[in-house]
């Protein structure tokens, strides 16, 4: 068995698809498959790129069909922390919303949140 380790896609679905084709994956029935290899996605699917949701959909379909495995990266972890409150402590979000750090965090996640809202 051959494994292709792929990380830091950051919402660049078109580049991901080009890479998969270059590695020998073929799109059949809506997902990419390889005749003998498995893709191992090591996170950072979102932030920065223009097609973050499509990137997640490509990876999800591959995992669902058994042609890939995936783990969450720090960018996905940060997005979850942005939306999650700490009920055991202050009730604040796990990732700051206020102050200079909050402005940075909001900017980092805004493109993805906007893309989700447009669906």
Walk through the language-model features, giving the residues of each.
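N-terminal active-site segment of His-dependent metallophosphoesterases
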Residues: 1-58, 75
């Amino acid at each position: 068995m051959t494994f292709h380790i792929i990380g830091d896609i950051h919402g660049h679905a078109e580049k991901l698809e080009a890479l998969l084709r270059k590695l020998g994956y073929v799109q059949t029935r809506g997902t990419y498959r390889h005749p003998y290899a498995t893709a191992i996605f090591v996170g950072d699917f979102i932030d920065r790129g223009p097609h973050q949701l499509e990137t997640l959909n490509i990876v999800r379909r591959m995992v669902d069909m058994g042609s890939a495995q995936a783990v969450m990266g720090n960018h996905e972890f940060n997005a979850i922390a942005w939306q999650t409150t700490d009920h055991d402590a202050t009730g604040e979000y796990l990732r700051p919303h206020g102050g200079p750090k909050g402005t940075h965090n909001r900017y980092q996640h805004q493109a993805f949140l906007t893309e989700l809202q447009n669906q």
